[in-house]
UniProtKB/Swiss-Prot annotation:
GO cellular component: cytosol
Pfam families, sorted: Trm112p (PF03966)
Top-rank taxon: Bacteria
InterPro entries per UniProt: Trm112-like
Family designation: Belongs to the UPF0434 family.
Protein name as catalogued: UPF0434 protein bsr0601
């Protein structure tokens, strides 16, 4: 019998990435699978993904360098 292969969400639907933008700059976002975040390079913010749901609130975002 095979062991379960289920694991936490590790990717974002590419179609979702096409339509999501940074709420501050309206620029594109990049998915960081290791940290489960959507990165806005132009705003220097990382938006968390919790339970597979992107949290697109600037006050919830982490500042990045």
């Amino acid at each position: 019998m095979n062991a379960p292969t289920e694991r936490p969400e590790t990717s974002v639907d590419p179609k979702l990435l096409e339509i999501l933008v940074c709420p501050l700059t309206k620029g594109p976002l990049e998915f960081d699978s290791a940290k489960q975040e959507l990165i806005s390079r132009s705003a220097k913010l990382a938006y968390p993904i919790r339970d597979g749901i992107p949290i697109m609130l600037p006050e919830e975002a982490r500042k990045i360098d």
